[in-house]
């Protein structure tokens, strides 16, 4: 993703006095001051006593049980996956539109800096942001506005840590603004990176390097990323968030990130207080906020404001929809004879369902893609399953004994979620949670289980049957899903990740082990 060094020299061969000249592109970029106070409040409460350069807290001591989405036993981020290098900063891109993008920088030093940027095809047209002072572990939210649609931009982060210190310049990074209808593009998907005892940081970086090689316009991560619910206290997981910024920052300086919540990410209302996790996620990871480009949740919540938990947008010929089944599920699962309602308590909630219905019914996109950590309800108490789970609960409308009680439990809703997706031409539902690759088909919809990007072993698929997967193409982790969208057809590939020690004549890193196509909706 890094462009030739000769282009970097255009940005960085400047004098010290020129680092912070009068801003000539004031109207084309701004620092998002409105969200900055919330971001500053979202730092780790233990940060003052535990801060290190690079922000990591080492070790993996664990006491007690792990347990579901509730509070678990971690006291520190598990080693070795969370033992990431120190660094002066990391950068994540988010919220790309036809005319803007958000750059979220997390510095680990004090100083002052600026973003310089220009269209790829006219590198001499350099603009820059206002000078920005920064403090260690206080996120910077920089929004570049007034950009050209359907354009690749290059940018660099230039900074000083003292007035007499040399100017530091990042590598040259890039991003692309919204593609128009008819243009081809690539995006990628991963899920369940975990960074727990079964995770390998080496494999994860290998996967992310493979993602970068695909040169996607953006990347979606389908949750179980921060594992907040596995810690004794939510704030103990802060180092986990920083580790993910290190890993995802290895590519997301040039690949905008969209995050979809998972059951372990600390924002399941039924599992207790979500305030710390929501504020921390919002401070460190810039998800879409509803505006003229993005549709989404417009109901503010407590001290957080916009939740940025479900959202939709258009890119080229495709509609993208990200869903959240955790914020509005307010009851915990009951087991055995106390579980009188099955999994009907799992829900998108009225507002999210009505929003989903409207987004689907008003879209004329050729492709419609839905992203969710697991199906709403699933097939069992742990919400496992693909198409075998699709007939049940809010997703499919039936109890596990086959009786249809949808209108009993959802009297204000038109139809179950799966039927809504079928009638509105959704081609693929991307879901995670179950930790392997599975491509299944049901009534014209592909249910694509997304593999882990970071599993520590070259795995097997024995858990597929245990989790209720009885059909389809099933393969083990690790790897990522690559989607190449064009107006005529969309190709979906499973790109495998192998460390050198695991490669042989039959498997090489970045091999494509399975591919299929989906066709556009006919008008």
Language model features: what each stretch is:
Residues 189-191, 219-224, 257-263, 369-373, ...:
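Active-site neighborhood of phospho(di)ester-bond hydrolases with catalytic His/Asp-centered motifs
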Residues 9-18:
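Bacterial N-terminal signal peptides
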Residues 1-10:
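Bacterial N-terminal signal peptides that target proteins for export
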Residues 185-260, 265:
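Conserved, compact domain cores that house catalytic/ligand-binding motifs in diverse enzymes
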Residues 25-189, 212-213, 476-477, 482-523:
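Acidic, histidine-bearing metal-coordination/catalytic regions of metal-dependent phosphoesterases
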Residues 144, 152-174, 233-364, 383-408, ...:
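Extended active-site neighborhood of metal-dependent phosphoesterases/phosphodiesterases
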Residues 222-229, 363-381:
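Short acidic, glycine-rich surface-loop motifs adjacent to enzyme active sites
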């Amino acid at each position: 993703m890094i462009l030739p060094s000769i282009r970097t020299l255009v940005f960085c061969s400047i004098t010290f006095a020129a680092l912070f000249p009068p801003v000539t592109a004031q109207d084309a970029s701004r620092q998002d001051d409105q969200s900055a106070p919330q971001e500053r409040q979202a730092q780790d409460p233990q940060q003052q006593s535990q801060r290190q350069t690079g922000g990591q807290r080492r070790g993996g001591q664990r006491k007690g049980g792990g347990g579901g989405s509730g509070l678990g036993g971690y006291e520190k981020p598990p080693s070795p996956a969370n033992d990431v290098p120190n660094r002066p900063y990391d950068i994540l891109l988010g919220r790309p539109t036809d005319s803007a993008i958000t750059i979220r920088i997390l510095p680990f030093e004090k100083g002052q800096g600026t973003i310089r940027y220009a269209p790829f095809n006219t590198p001499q047209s350099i603009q820059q942001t206002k000078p920005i002072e920064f403090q260690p572990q206080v996120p910077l939210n920089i929004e570049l506005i007034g950009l050209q649609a359907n354009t690749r931009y290059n940018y660099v982060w230039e900074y000083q840590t003292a007035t007499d210190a040399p100017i530091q310049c990042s590598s040259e990074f890039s991003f692309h603004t919204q593609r128009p209808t008819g243009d081809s593009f690539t995006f990628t998907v991963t899920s369940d990176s975990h960074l727990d005892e079964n995770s390998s940081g080496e494999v994860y970086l290998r996967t992310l390097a493979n993602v970068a090689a695909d040169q996607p316009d953006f990347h979606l991560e389908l949750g179980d990323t921060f594992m907040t619910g596995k810690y004794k206290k939510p704030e103990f997981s802060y180092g986990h968030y920083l580790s993910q910024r290190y890993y995802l920052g290895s590519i997301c300086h040039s690949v905008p990130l969209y995050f979809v919540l998972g059951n372990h990410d600390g924002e399941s209302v039924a599992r207790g207080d979500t305030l710390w996790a929501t504020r921390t996620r919002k401070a460190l990871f810039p998800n879409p906020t509803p505006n003229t480009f993005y549709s989404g949740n417009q109901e503010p919540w407590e001290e957080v404001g916009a939740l940025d938990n479900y959202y939709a947008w258009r890119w080229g010929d495709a509609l993208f929809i990200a869903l959240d089944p955790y914020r509005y599920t307010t009851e915990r699962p009951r087991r055995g004879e106390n579980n009188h309602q099955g999994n009907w308590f799992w829900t998108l909630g009225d507002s999210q369902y009505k929003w989903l219905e409207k987004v689907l019914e008003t879209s004329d996109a050729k492709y419609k893609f839905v992203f969710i950590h697991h199906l709403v309800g699933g097939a069992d108490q742990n919400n496992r399953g693909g198409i075998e789970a699709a007939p049940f609960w809010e997703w499919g409308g039936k109890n596990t004994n086959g009786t249809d009680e949808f209108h009993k439990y959802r009297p204000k809703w038109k139809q179950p979620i799966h039927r809504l997706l079928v009638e509105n031409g959704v081609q693929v539902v991307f879901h995670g949670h179950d930790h392997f690759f599975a491509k299944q088909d049901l009534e014209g919809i592909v249910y694509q289980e997304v593999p882990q990007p970071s599993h520590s072993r070259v795995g097997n698929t024995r858990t597929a049957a245990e989790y209720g997967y009885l059909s389809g193409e099933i393969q083990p982790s690790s790897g990522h899903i690559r989607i190449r969208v064009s107006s005529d057809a969309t190709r979906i590939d499973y790109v495998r990740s192998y460390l050198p020690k695991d490669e042989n004549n039959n498997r090489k890193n970045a091999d494509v082990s399975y591919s299929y196509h989906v066709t556009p909706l006919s008008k």
